[in-house]
């Protein structure tokens, strides 16, 4: 599938689920700096291969927020995709929640107000913060993974590496002690 076909498929699924916008962060469930290919959902939906970015797809727009380190790369990789670059390092660039609320207020009131995210890609605090900010602007955050049902062909598997234990001399605390603290 091309980027345009992926965006069309995502929008069709969004309509089916009653979703107005979908946020696709360039992260994994562990907030890892170096993530496994399986979790490169933002790259898959936009074509942008940079290490930092977040995509927002609405029923009629597609945008990518990234910082100044990736502007040139993003411009080149987004060419021909209909994905608009949002230069988040620029002083006048709105945050994603600000953009969503403003865009909703400026003419899409007749559409649904649901904003979907895959909750696995957010920390608990990050999710709560986003939910609260969107609610204040009249939008509803919903937990729906909209990418996995679409990215079925050629998606790399989740790695199955063995676990290993860091010795206490490196961590400063035993496994037993850590487990006791969380129980």
Model-found features: residue ranges?
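N-terminal accessory/capping or targeting/presequence segment of soluble
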Residues: 2-104, 118, 122-183
